Amino acid sequence: MWWKFRDPWDDSFAKGVTAALEAHGREAHDPWCIGFFVDNEINWGGPSDLAKWILQSPADQPAKAAFADWLAKAYGSFPALGEKWGRPYADRADFMGSVALPGEGAKDDLYKFSCIVIDEYFRRTREAVKAFDPQLLYLGCRLAGHARDEVAAACARHCDVVSYNIYRETIDDWRWPGGIDAPVMIGEFHFGATDRGPFGTGVRQADNQVDRAEKMKGYVRSALANPQIVGVHWHQFSDQATSGRFDGEYLQVGWTDICDTPYPEAVSALRQLAGEIYSTR
């Protein structure tokens, strides 16, 4: 599932982040809590899509006003902008009221402002997290798979630790795009089997519970072998209900079943891994 992108210039954006953090105030002050993920697997669209979506928004969209400010500074007037874009604008109000996409002449501007939007999202989210508790780490937004270079670079600039959800057999050969150097936490990974529990195996399938435990160990060991990875975060602690969660997902991916009974193979694998971590790295 890809979650919709929110307008970082809207007053409700920072308030929403703060409200979400405050709702987890008890966890935030737990000594075992190192930080927070904010958001999950956002839909960033293509290289210029964020700017295009902003142009197609109504006149009262705060991001559209920010785009207008940026363009006015770059071109001096909206008629001059219209000449470049191949879309006549009489003035700022005309620009704000239009939802039509411009011509090929807008290509560079759309890409540049999309990058600005991405940076603003991470900057404002970091501000909200640090205002809530400066000691907590901002763990990013759990990027899905391999994010575009622009997203990865902005994330690395503003996050204490960058989170990626990477569903693979192993990640020892995974590297940052564009040669970026920043600490990475795996936000999600799992393996599922259908010999016990619900009927869904999740993203990565195992033959049975023994095979699942071996695959889990292989993934964690590959993370230990990758110097850019500082942690892995299993998805999820318990199996999902056979009747499905809010979107119908029902996976056998937990360390415990739906009756909170541990899978002994998983527990044994975790215990073995815990004994290896500090001698390995």
Briefly describe each language-model feature range.
Residues 30-152:
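Polysaccharide-binding and catalytic clefts of secreted carbohydrate-active enzymes
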Residues 1-18, 71, 104-119, 159-168, ...:
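The substrate-binding groove and active-site-proximal loops of carbohydrate-active enzymes
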Residues 1-6, 96-111, 144, 180-219, ...:
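Active-site clefts of carbohydrate-active enzymes
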Residues 53-66, 235-281:
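Aromatic-rich peripheral "rim/lid" segments of glycoside hydrolase catalytic domains that contact
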Residues 31-35, 39-41, 137, 196, ...:
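Substrate-binding cleft of secreted/luminal carbohydrate-active enzymes
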Residues 1-29, 122-132, 156-157, 177-179, ...:
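Aromatic-lined substrate-binding rim segments of carbohydrate-active enzymes
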Residues 46-52, 174-176, 196-197, 244-245:
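Short, solvent-exposed loop/turn and secondary-structure capping segments
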Residues 112, 116-202, 217-224:
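Glycoside hydrolase catalytic-domain groove-lining segments
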